[in-house]
């Protein structure tokens, strides 16, 4: 896998210990990670479908297939929220893409479990969720037995050449810091920022524990200022979010 594709999984589950098997320059499709916001996307309640996201993903896939950079590339789509969205997308694929192309491109649409141990050159992730209310959605944590973290970990690491994160959310206002969905969206919008910020944290940290705390808070979406000066003293770090600040001594 390319470094950029294992970056999110490294951050989420492996404490940055996985080493990439391919060089970053070995893919001919750029950018390697794309965030695509469906501004009118809406989850249809208990059905756990987002028809506009489904339509957008199929339209993007068809557009890719027409470009020379994607000649011979295989495609996959992963729903991050249940099998009803899988059916919604699969129906559109069957309707809008020629069956010969479906076979030639080895198109697979499913959930994370369907892609365990499998890959495609180009992967589209459908987040499904939307927010029609004021204020952020309830926090999505790792789930019982780490189920959600495992789901996201697999989904974000199935692409060989390009990963699309297709969502209907404004990560800044619709999601809380630490929410799995926010972490994935933020990563997809600027994957290099995470590795760059981690290097800065490593330089400023005065102990391994302080480094681990600062990295975890940053990964969860907090703005971290290390070695905060207060008069003649220094605080290990201050975590900032909106109008709130918390001082942390390690």
Question: What positions do the PLM features span?
Answer:
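Active-site beta-strand-loop-beta-strand hairpin of nuclease catalytic cores
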Residues: 238-247
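A short beta-strand element within the Helicase C-terminal
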Residues: 118-130, 137, 163-164
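Conserved helicase motor
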Residues: 80-82, 109-115
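Short glycine-/polar-rich loops that comprise or flank the Walker A/P-loop
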Residues: 31-33, 105, 119-122, 159-163
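Conserved helicase/translocase motor-coupling segment
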Residues: 16-91
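Active-site ExK catalytic segment of metal-dependent nucleases
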Residues: 126-128, 247-250
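Helicase C-terminal subdomain and adjacent C-terminal extension
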Residues: 10, 23, 96, 134-231, ...
């Amino acid at each position: 896998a390319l470094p950029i594709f294992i970056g999110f999984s490294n951050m989420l589950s492996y404490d940055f210990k996985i080493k990439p098997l391919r060089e970053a320059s070995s893919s001919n499709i750029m950018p390697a990670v794309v965030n695509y916001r469906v501004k009118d996307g809406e989850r249809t309640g208990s059905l756990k479908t987002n028809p506009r996201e489904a339509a957008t993903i199929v339209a993007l896939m068809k557009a890719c297939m027409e470009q020379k950079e994607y000649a011979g590339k295989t495609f996959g789509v992963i729903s991050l929220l249940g099998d009803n969205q899988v059916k919604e997308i699969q129906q559109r694929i069957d309707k809008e893409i020629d069956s010969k192309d479906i076979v030639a491109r080895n198109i697979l649409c499913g959930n994370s479990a369907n892609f365990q141990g499998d890959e495609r050159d180009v992967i589209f992730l459908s987040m499904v969720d939307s927010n029609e209310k004021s204020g952020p959605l309830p926090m999505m944590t790792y789930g019982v037995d780490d189920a959600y973290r495992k789901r996201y970990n697999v989904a974000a690491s199935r692409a060989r050449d390009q990963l699309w994160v297709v969502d209907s959310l404004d990560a800044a206002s619709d999601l809380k810091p630490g929410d799995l969905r926010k972490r994935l969206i933020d990563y997809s919008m600027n994957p290099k920022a995470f590795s760059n910020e981690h290097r800065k944290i490593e330089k400023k940290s005065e102990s391994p524990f302080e480094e681990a705390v600062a990295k975890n808070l940053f990964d969860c979406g907090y703005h971290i200022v290390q070695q905060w000066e207060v008069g003649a003293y220094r605080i290990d770090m201050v975590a900032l979010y909106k109008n709130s600040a918390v001082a942390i001594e390690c």
